Amino acid sequence: MTILGTTFGMVFSLLQVVSGESGYAQNGDLEDAELDDYSFSCYSQLEVNGSQHSLTCAFEDPDVNITNLEFEICGALVEVKCLNFRKLQEIYFIETKKFLLIGKSNICVKVGEKSLTCKKIDLTTIVKPEAPFDLSVVYREGANDFVVTFNTSHLQKKYVKVLMHDVAYRQEKDENKWTHVNLSSTKLTLLQRKLQPAAMYEIKVRSIPDHYFKGFWSEWSPSYYFRTPEINNSSGEMDPILLTISILSFFSVALLVILACVLWKKRIKPIVWPSLPDHKKTLEHLCKKPRKNLNVSFNPESFLDCQIHRVDDIQARDEVEGFLQDTFPQQLEESEKQRLGGDVQSPNCPSEDVVITPESFGRDSSLTCLAGNVSACDAPILSSSRSLDCRESGKNGPHVYQDLLLSLGTTNSTLPPPFSLQSGILTLNPVAQGQPILTSLGSNQEEAYVTMSSFYQNQ
């Protein structure tokens, strides 16, 4: 019996070893499964098919053996407690209307009934939008720019409507030099001057949720290719017409500045900023009222109290006085000899050389009459003929000169007679014969100057 029991024990042990090597032990599978890394990631898509939402999960390590693994979600569900994922090659997904979208759900990786790893995830924070589509680029020749437009399915959805888009473009020969532009609309304008001329460009776009919903970038849209037009003139060259206009404008401005600097003080400043006199005198001149009844008239009635002599009258008197200086001393000397000599020599009448006529007074005897000289106008005029009585002329010689001097003097004139008269007799200093006449001339000139000065003062 002992030998039989030992034999059965050895056979049983051999069976266990053989069965373990052939892979039929479930406990060994569990131990090997616990040694692998089952980390995973998930994303949700809302309203992918009408009102249904989808949840997709996948292992981060692509080498994990997923033959006996399953995914299960529990919590934040409507009408059910848990839901199992469907397996599609290397991914697990579920599409249903029973997501509550409020709160967190528990997602686990299971082998049979045993959970290997679990995560708590809020489906509103792992939203991945759908990729944009209908990407196109249109060139506007007038504006020299490119208009980029695209479309997205989230514009008609209720939940994820606000998206941020990322537009990326590059020149075809530059594989890794992408230029990114973020925008919230579905339209973008690219300026031609920011792109290389005659070059091929590739452009694509993707989206990400914004505001309440959070998540990941969507897949890139299909790429679109466009070519930029050629430019006749390179960026380094300049239009000759524009260059000529620029040069002429520069020189014109420089010339104007130089002329303004040169002519500022003499021409421009007096016109723009005229120099004003003293403000007090200017205001006094502007505000002072003129006096009334100013004596600015040249009417003779306005100068009745002034003695006015014309220049011609003064010149005539000067000529007469000069004539008397030459003629009267000779006549006076002869008459003096006749008076002292008695009857030694017969008296002679005045010759034609000493005859005094109105023409000798300046050829204008009417000037004295105009001045109011009545005696001069009534005085007898000496003729060139001899006197009727030469004897009486010898005795009355002084009276003749006295009448002549009286005819020169006037009652209204300010000029005194050139000789001093005492009781009708003309007296002269025998020592200096010309002195009385010179003295009379000096006084006459001073009186004429005073008269003209008073005339200008009154004026």
Curated annotation (Swiss-Prot):
Keywords: Cell membrane, Disease variant, Disulfide bond, Glycoprotein, Membrane, Phosphoprotein, Receptor, SCID, Secreted, Signal, Transmembrane, Transmembrane helix, Ubl conjugation. Residues 21-239 are extracellular. Disulfide bonds join 42-57, 74-82, 108-118. The keyword Cell cycle does not apply. GO terms for molecular function: antigen binding; cytokine receptor activity; interleukin-7 receptor activity. Residues 131-231 form the Fibronectin type-III domain. InterPro entries: FN3_7 (IPR040997), FN3_dom (IPR003961), FN3_sf (IPR036116), Hempt_rcpt_S_F1_CS (IPR003531), Ig-like_fold (IPR013783). Glycans are attached at residues 49, 65, 151, 182, 232-233. GO terms for biological process: B cell homeostasis; B cell proliferation; cell morphogenesis; cell surface receptor signaling pathway; cellular homeostasis; cytokine-mediated signaling pathway; defense response to Gram-positive bacterium; gene expression. The chain crosses the membrane at residues 240-264. The modification Phosphothreonine is found at residue 282. Pfam families: fn3, FN3_7. Residues 1-20 form the signal peptide. A motif (Box 1 motif) lies at residues 272-280. One of its GO terms (cellular component) is cytosol. A motif (WSXWS motif) lies at residues 217-221. N-glycosylated IL-7Ralpha binds IL7 300-fold more tightly than the unglycosylated form. Ubiquitinated by MARCHF8; leading to lysosomal degradation. The WSXWS motif appears to be necessary for proper protein folding and thereby efficient intracellular transport and cell-surface receptor binding. Belongs to the type I cytokine receptor family. Type 4 subfamily. The IL7 receptor is a heterodimer of IL7R and IL2RG. The TSLP receptor is a heterodimer of CRLF2 and IL7R. Interacts with CD53. Receptor for interleukin-7. Also acts as a receptor for thymic stromal lymphopoietin (TSLP). It is linked to Immunodeficiency 104, severe combined: A form of severe combined immunodeficiency (SCID), a genetically and clinically heterogeneous group of rare congenital disorders characterized by impairment of both humoral and cell-mediated immunity, leukopenia, and low or absent antibody levels. Patients present in infancy recurrent, persistent infections by opportunistic organisms. The common characteristic of all types of SCID is absence of T-cell-mediated cellular immunity due to a defect in T-cell development. Multiple sclerosis 3: A multifactorial, inflammatory, demyelinating disease of the central nervous system. Sclerotic lesions are characterized by perivascular infiltration of monocytes and lymphocytes and appear as indurated areas in pathologic specimens (sclerosis in plaques). The pathological mechanism is regarded as an autoimmune attack of the myelin sheath, mediated by both cellular and humoral immunity. Clinical manifestations include visual loss, extra-ocular movement disorders, paresthesias, loss of sensation, weakness, dysarthria, spasticity, ataxia and bladder dysfunction. This is Interleukin-7 receptor subunit alpha. It comes from Homo sapiens (Human). The lineage of its organism: Eukaryota, Metazoa, Chordata, Craniata, Vertebrata. The gene is IL7R.
